[in-house]
Amino acid sequence: MIKFSRRRLAKLANAQIDDRIDYKNVDLLRQFLTEEGKILPRRVTGLTAKQQRGMTRAIKQARIMALLEFIHR
């Protein structure tokens, strides 16, 4: 028997998405990283595909700008 998971609402659905997802907003970006520093997948975060792409870009930019670490030890 196949079990279907219930659709989740995006965590950032009610907020202004474009304003909040930014490489300078380090506190928000850290919520979407594991303890090892890996980016959490969409099925865990509950973001839409567009939001996840923006989040990934922002995290990668923050890493390049040295606002986030590449590896957490």
UniProtKB/Swiss-Prot annotation:
GO BP annotations, alphabetical order: translation
Pfam families for the chain: Ribosomal_S18
Compartments (UniProt record): Plastid, Chloroplast
Family: Belongs to the bacterial ribosomal protein bS18 family.
NCBIfam families: S18 (TIGR00165)
GO cellular component: chloroplast; mitochondrial small ribosomal subunit
Transmembrane helix found in the keyword field: no
Name of the protein: Small ribosomal subunit protein bS18c
Species per Swiss-Prot/TrEMBL record: Nephroselmis olivacea
Quaternary organization: Part of the 30S ribosomal subunit.
GO MF annotation list: small ribosomal subunit rRNA binding; structural constituent of ribosome
